[in-house]
Swiss-Prot record:
GO MF annotation terms: ATP binding; transmembrane receptor protein tyrosine kinase activity
Recorded name of the encoding gene: epha4a
Name this polypeptide is given: Ephrin type-A receptor 4a
Membrane topology: Single-pass type I membrane protein
BP GO terms, sorted: anterior/posterior pattern specification; cell surface receptor protein tyrosine kinase signaling pathway; cell-cell recognition; forebrain development; negative regulation of axon extension; negative regulation of collateral sprouting of intact axon in response to injury; optic vesicle morphogenesis; regulation of myelination
Domain Protein kinase intervals: 1-265
Positions of the catalytic residues: D120 (proton acceptor)
Entry comment describing in which tissues the protein is expressed: Widely expressed in the developing nervous system.
C-alpha cells in the first residue's frame, strides 16, 4: 500500500489468540539496515505504543524476533488525508470537513496533554478510515518536550530545511520559530495544524502552491498568510490566522481549538458566511496584517 522511509508498507490480516481477525498495515524494515536504522524504525513504534486515543493511529504490535522486522498498526482503508481529499474534491459538506478537522484537533490535544510534540503534522501524515475518522500518524519525528531540542539537528540554511533523525523538516508546515531557532513546542504544532486546516478546506491543495521554500520563509517573515480557500467559512479562516500568529504565545491551545470547532458544529449557521471568494489571488498570499 505504500513505501515508507525504511521500507514498504503492506496490508495484511492479524489473528491473535482469542481475538477476531483484523485488517492491519505492516511496515517492514528493508534488508541491509544498520543498527541505528533498526533503532530509529522501532522508536516510532515505541512512541505510538504509549498512545491510546481514537484519533491517533493504533499500534497493534511489533515483530522483532525474526526478519524482516515489522511494525503492525490498525489499517486505514482510505489512506493518507491529502490524497483522499484530492480524489474526492468538492464532495463533502462543510460540516463533514469541520468534523475531520475536529478529529485531528482532538488527537493533537491528546498528544500535547501527553507532552508530545509531533513536529511533522501535515495532511500527508494523517490517515483516514472507512468511516471518515482521521488519525494522526507518522511519529518518526515526534519528541518528548523535555528532550534537548538541539540534539538531533544540524542546520541546513541553504535549502531552508533542517536535517533531523526523522529526515528533513517540511518548511511550509513548520512554524517560523521552529525553522529559525529549532523551537519545537505544542505551539509550533498548532501552526502546522493551521496549515492542515487550509489543506482540508482546499481539498488537498499544496500550501503556498509553487513558491520556493525560501520565498515561503521570506513571505511569512513579512507577515503574509495563506488566503481562505474557495468557499471557506470566514470563522474557519480566522481560526487558521490565529494558528499562524507570529508570537507563539498568542496562538490558541489545542483544547481551545477543539472547543471552537465543537461550537461551530453545534451552530452550523456560523459556517454560512464565506469571504469574497478568492480561489487563488494574484498576490498569491494575503497582504501583511497591518499592526493594530
Amino acid at each position: 500500500i505504500g513505501i515508507g522511509e525504511f521500507g514498504e508498507v503492506c496490508s495484511g490480516r492479524l489473528k491473535m489468540p482469542g481475538k477476531r481477525e483484523i485488517c492491519v498495515a505492516i511496515k517492514t524494515l528493508k534488508a541491509g539496515y544498520t543498527d541505528k536504522q533498526r533503532r530509529d524504525f522501532l522508536s516510532e513504534a515505541s512512541i505510538m505504543g504509549q498512545f491510546d486515543h481514537p484519533n491517533i493511529i493504533r499500534l497493534e504490535g511489533v515483530v522483532t524476533k525474526c526478519k524482516p522486522v515489522m511494525i503492525i498498526t490498525e489499517y486505514m482503508e482510505n489512506g493518507s488525508l491529502d490524497a483522499f481529499l484530492r480524489k474526492n474534491d468538492g464532495r463533502f459538506t462543510v460540516i463533514q470537513l469541520v468534523g475531520i478537522l475536529r478529529g485531528i484537533a482532538s488527537g493533537m490535544k491528546y498528544l500535547s496533554d501527553m507532552s508530545y510534540v509531533h513536529r511533522d503534522l501535515a495532511a500527508r501524515n494523517i490517515l483516514v478510515n472507512s468511516n471518515l475518522v482521521c488519525k494522526v500518524s507518522d511519529f518518526g519525528m515526534s519528541r518528548v518536550l523535555e528532550e534537548d531540542p538541539d540534539a538531533a539537528y544540524t542546520t541546513r540554511e541553504i535549502t531552508g530545511t533542517y536535517q533531523s533523525q526523522g529526515g528533513k523538516i517540511p518548511i511550509r508546515w513548520t512554524a517560523p520559530e521552529a525553522i529559525t531557532y529549532r523551537k519545537f513546542t505544542s505551539a509550533s504544532d498548532v501552526w502546522s495544524y493551521g496549515i492542515v486546516m487550509w489543506e482540508v478546506m482546499s481539498y488537498g491543495e499544496r500550501p503556498y502552491w509553487d513558491m520556493s521554500n525560501q520565498d515561503v520563509i521570506k513571505a511569512i517573515e513579512e507577515g503574509y498568510r495563506l488566503p481562505p480557500p474557495m468557499d471557506c467559512p470566514v470563522s474557519l479562516h480566522q481560526l487558521m490566522l490565529d494558528c499562524w500568529q507570529k508570537e507563539r504565545a498568542e496562538r490558541p491551545k489545542f483544547s481551545q481549538i477543539v472547543n471552537m470547532l465543537d461550537k461551530l458544529i453545534r451552530n452550523p449557521n456560523s459556517l454560512k458566511r464565506t469571504g469574497g471568494e478568492i480561489a487563488r489571488p494574484n498576490t498569491t498570499l494575503l497582504e501583511p496584517s497591518s499592526p493594530e
